[in-house]
Amino acid sequence: MSKVRIFALGGLDEDGKNMFVIENNDDIFVIECGMRYPTSDEQLGVEMITPDFQYLVENEKRIKGVFVTHGHDDVMGALTQFLKQVKAPIYMAPLTARLFERKARKEGIRDVEIHRIRRNTNFKIGKTEIRTFGTTQSIADGFGVAIRTEDGYVVYTSEFIVDYDVKMDAFRFDLTEVTELGSRGVLALLTESVGSTREGHSSPNHRITSQVEPIFDNAEGRIVCTVYNQNLYRVIELIELANKFKRKVMIYDDELRSLMVDMADLGYYRIPAGLEIAPQNFSNDMDNIVVIIGGTGSTIFRKVHKIASREDDVIQLRDTDTVIVASPAVPGTERDASNMEDDLYKETSRVYGVDTKRTFSMHASIEDLKMMIYLMNPQYYVPVKGEYRQLISNANIALDMGYPANNIIVLENGMIACIEDGQLQREMKTVPVGDVMVSGGDSLDAAGMVLKDRETLSTDGAIVVGVVVNHGTKEIIGGPDVQSRGVIYLKDADYIIREIGVIMENTINTAVAEKRYDNLECRAEAREKIARYVMKETGKRPMILPAIVEINTKD
């Protein structure tokens, strides 16, 4: 009996944090290992959010391979966190491997088993046949992956658009292999849903050249562009425009410069000779130049804020500059993006954004998805990667094409689609899932004390109460000293501070008199009493931090 199980540890009903699991009998294949940025109410010092890897940790020995289809954070950003817990072979294309290896070195991850594979290839992992096919997306070397089962292939498309005019092989969509896979028999097709609400094809609306070229043509001074590092397609468009208008280019980001070196080393794309100026040779009084400011997530907006505030050592904006914001906000970065635009308008009135209604992100639109479904002709269709409305929109595309509703599988994170002997089982089981907050490289339990403490501090403040007692007699010899931050306006609430001190004294003195004094227990008792009193007087629940310092004194 053949048994295929399909489920997600992240990436369903959310933007980012993509991680999908295909179980072929006893073998586990993982596709993607991504993160997402925290929303404004999740921040609290959290840098990123990853899937909970508990299921994979418990089943580590069954994992035969982890496929990372391209170098975006939403599919690769959690890989270092994953490898701190699980040892597994990683399969990725050469450019993605270079990106990851730099990140792994920074985080001290070593001895990773990385298999560099071509975008269009077939090979075996154990007895399982794997086929890959190149896709057109915003970063080079992207691919989709097909895993052979006894009942047909399980295919994951990754991000893709259908574009027949791509000049560079590293961005080309492999229509031939997609057609070949369809003819071999596809059991289940997993496609992205982010662009499933857009009519038509994404191409040629994914290009910014037609929108940005008139700005280049009319610009008299410098041109400053912001762009995400991982949108290499857009970076190359800007470089080619600079070359067309005979302007030099300065790339102002170490990671983006490294990526362009990687592109040249791998033979994918080379910046035209003599066009690029290194940052150390850049002068702020240069006019005939395009400055490309790269970055990821919110870092790019903070970098531009620093430049606009004249705090940067290399670039200062001038009122003659033309600024093109080609890095639209992504979920979790909206506030930083808005602040950046305000800062830019204070320095120059020539600020242009990329119209997201005219320029599509490089995700499959409705007609792209229809073509993929038609060519693959899967038995089961599984929308993935997107918010719930996008998953439903994607499902409706297949429904409109005549697919039976019972053959369209819309899952939530953790829900398992189980296909036995080619037939979907009605009983729906689940695996444990959740969000893991990462701060400073360390994982924080989303429901744990660290985040609860941070939330308390951000809303209700903190009160610290300190006393010094004689180690031998337990007599109070110093304090109490009460410090309040973010709780009350001290001028109007002296009586509260005095009463908190009295509560602390009485708690210690009573415990000593009753011969039950214990430092830890006294602090816990004082914390509880002070919290009740402050709640009654102020309506707040601040963090209460009692401190009892015991010292030896000589008579």
State where each predicted segment sits.
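Flexible glycine-/small-residue-rich
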Residues: 134, 149, 293-295, 467-469, ...
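C-terminal tails and terminal domains of large nucleic-acid-associated
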Residues: 519-552
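His/Asp/Glu-rich metal-coordinating catalytic cores
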Residues: 1-67, 72-283, 302-313, 335-338
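Conserved hydrophobic residues forming the short capping helix/wall of the S-adenosyl-L-methionine
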Residues: 104, 398, 534
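Structured loop/turn residues at beta-strand edges in well-structured enzyme cores
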Residues: 61, 128, 183-184, 286, ...
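Short acidic-glycine loop/turn motifs at beta-strand connectors
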Residues: 23-26, 148-151, 243, 419-421, ...
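Hard-cation-handling environments
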Residues: 197-326, 330-355, 359-499, 503-516, ...
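C-terminal edge-of-domain segments
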Residues: 456-458, 468, 545-555
